[in-house]
Amino acid sequence: DGMREQLRQAKPDCLEDLVALNALYRPGPMDQIPHFIDRKFGREKVEYLDQRMEPILRETYGIMVYQEQVMLVARAIGGYSLGGADLLRRAMGKKNVEEMKRQRAVFIKGAAERNVSEETATEIFNLMEKFAGYGFNKSHAAAYSYVAWQTAYLKVHHTACFFAGNLCLVMDQGDKMRTLIDGARNCFFAAGRERQ
């Protein structure tokens, strides 16, 4: 499974890593996962198109992951208000061509007022546009990741209870029951003994 392989490679050692990987594992930003992993382990240098982006993107190794980061970059580089940044995020998500042309001009003008070249501003806007279309908001990614972490903990440390509880939930769904029973067999036999 793709996400499992990404987790093996990333070796998350904190909840923030799980949250970021969860948010990255989506159609738009998925191609950034190898960069996230390489930057985490120092195999790739973390670079920022503008140093004002560093405090915003530091926790994700310079990669735009969350909708909130898009909004903060719009504020720091393009001079947007909070409300304006949220409108930009929404426009990017809807992919309205005319509105995006207008927003691009506003962003580049605001960036120029903050001594950012048009070339750099365009590059930053393109990154924002790419991620805002598919970006997850951080609180949703955190909630999903926390539940996934709890579920994994229960599966590893309280295996029998984990499978018993899940089987109770899907008793009337044959395919799901078979999948869970196979998973339980694999867990118990992989351990070489019955686990509690």
Q: For each predicted feature, which ranges?
A:
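Noncatalytic, beta-rich nucleic-acid-contacting surfaces in large DNA/RNA-processing enzymes
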Residues: D1-Q196
